[in-house]
Swiss-Prot record:
GO terms for molecular function: nicotinate phosphoribosyltransferase activity. GO terms for biological process: NAD biosynthetic process via the salvage pathway. This is Nicotinate phosphoribosyltransferase. It catalyses: nicotinate + 5-phospho-alpha-D-ribose 1-diphosphate + ATP + H2O = nicotinate beta-D-ribonucleotide + ADP + phosphate + diphosphate. Belongs to the NAPRTase family. It comes from the Bacteria. Keywords: Ligase, Phosphoprotein, Pyridine nucleotide biosynthesis. The modification Phosphohistidine is found at residue 220. One of its GO terms (cellular component) is cytosol. Transiently phosphorylated on a His residue during the reaction cycle. Phosphorylation strongly increases the affinity for substrates and increases the rate of nicotinate D-ribonucleotide production. Dephosphorylation regenerates the low-affinity form of the enzyme, leading to product release. The gene is pncB. It comes from Salmonella arizonae (strain ATCC BAA-731 / CDC346-86 / RSK2980).
């Protein structure tokens, strides 16, 4: 299946902010590290029939480059150093790093190459896959249906929050990777801009064009890669946390907690890390249980939780965000990142549950265990056992 009308992507910045934040850190600290990443469809969708159309889009991505106005805008942000931006200016996607195949109906994608380059593929490639699939499956759906669905949800949201002080409710768009389309995401974000509690987007292209704050710090791959970069597996998570602070000592300080598990993370997150990092991000497991653990941990360390921020981003919708806000708002600062339930929330459209995750670093296995068993990713069961032993984790979960 080929012949999609035009390139899905129009900007190198049409990606999540944390990709550029991590890429700069990799550029400065791990320039020669090699990685492999693989696509996973967590649902039962057979997407192999779209392999040729995806390949066309991958090949078209080599023509994307940082435009002068984009370069100038990035230069005005506090996150980036000149040497990195000069390098990014010359960056081009290399389609040879991407292998796309149809394996009896199953879509297989494997990415290999220098981490500093491979890191850029994940988010735009997932957005491409999502948009292509929805284009073929739901050709009559689009912006109008998405906007109608959002307006209906906002009416419910207003009723749900009528008795609440919403002055500390902060919502972000995290919807790039599984969006229905680029146009739908832009329309949804522009509508949300009218709400006082909407604070930004993870999409750098939208942030630039709509004058929004770009939101994001680091992803699982930052911690996964350190499982092989660090000489000692048991201290690899601490090495990842320290390296991030080395790159960003005073900003972008929200740490992702579930690459191993929340309990293993908190054992590594001592008073020095907890003091320097501005907060934590939840991405798997029970959110209330996680939040209670985070608050108790700060209190145990003598840190006032109200000086820290908890970011919730796992399978959220507006109703779940309000429930969490009710539970935690008086005890800690809060932000909520909603993705699929904003940018692919259309009646009769089934969002894709798709990911691309790191599987190797410097030719050796890495793993994500998480606080949700179904999210465990690793080929090498022996490495998963070693990882669990290194982090003193009791039960064994199946590696997928």
């Amino acid at each position: 299946m080929t012949q999609f009308a035009s390139p899905v992507l129009h900007s190198l910045l049409d990606t999540d902010a944390y990709k550029l934040h991590m890429q700069q850190a990799v550029f400065h600290h791990y320039y020669d590290v090699q990685v492999a990443a693989e696509f996973r469809c967590r649902g039962d969708d057979l997407l192999g029939i779209y392999a040729d159309a995806i390949r066309e889009q991958v090949d078209a991505m080599q023509h994307l480059r940082l435009q002068e106005d984009e370069f100038q805008w990035l230069s005005g942000l506090p996150f980036f150093k000149t040497d990195y931006l000069d390098w990014l200016r010359e960056f081009r996607y290399d389609p040879a790093q991407v292998c796309v195949t149809n394996d009896n109906g199953k879509l297989n994608i494997r990415l290999t190459g220098p981490w500093r380059e491979v890191i850029m593929w994940e988010v735009p490639l997932l957005a491409v896959i999502s948009e292509l699939v929805h284009h073929y499956r739901s050709p009559k759906a689009g912006v109008d249906q998405a906007l109608d669905a959002l307006e209906s949800k906002l009416v419910d949201f207003t009723a749900l929050t009528a008795d609440l002080d919403m002055s500390r409710f902060h919502l972000m768009d995290f919807g790039t990777r599984r969006r229905f389309s680029r146009e739908v995401q832009q329309t949804i974000v522009k509508r949300l801009q009218q709400e006082p509690w909407f604070v930004g987007t993870s999409n750098y292209d939208l942030a630039r064009r709509l004058a929004l704050m770009p939101m994001g710090t680091q992803a699982h791959e930052w911690f996964q890669a350190h499982q092989q970069i660090s000489p000692d597996l048991a201290t690899s998570q601490r090495a990842a946390l320290a390296a991030w602070l080395n790159e960003y000592p005073d900003q972008l300080g929200i740490a992702l907690t579930d690459c191993i598990t929340m309990d293993a993370f908190l054992r590594d997150f001592g008073v020095e890390f907890a003091s320097h990092y501005q907060g934590l991000r939840h991405d798997s497991g029970d959110p209330v249980e996680w939040g209670e653990k985070a608050i108790a941990h700060y209190e145990k360390l003598g840190i006032d939780p109200m000086t820290k921020t908890l970011v919730f981003s796992d399978n959220l919708d507006l109703q779940k965000a309000v429930e969490l806000y009710r539970h935690f708002a008086s005890r800690v600062q809060l932000s909520f990142g909603i993705g699929t339930r904003l940018t692919c929330d259309i009646p009769q459209v089934k969002p894709l549950n798709i990911v691309i995750k790191l599987v190797e670093c410097n030719g050796k296995p890495v793993a994500k265990l998480s606080d949700s068993p179904g999210k465990t990713i690793c080929h090498d069961k022996a490495f998963v056992r070693a990882l669990r032993k290194a982090f003193d984790l009791p039960q064994v979960r199946k590696a997928s």
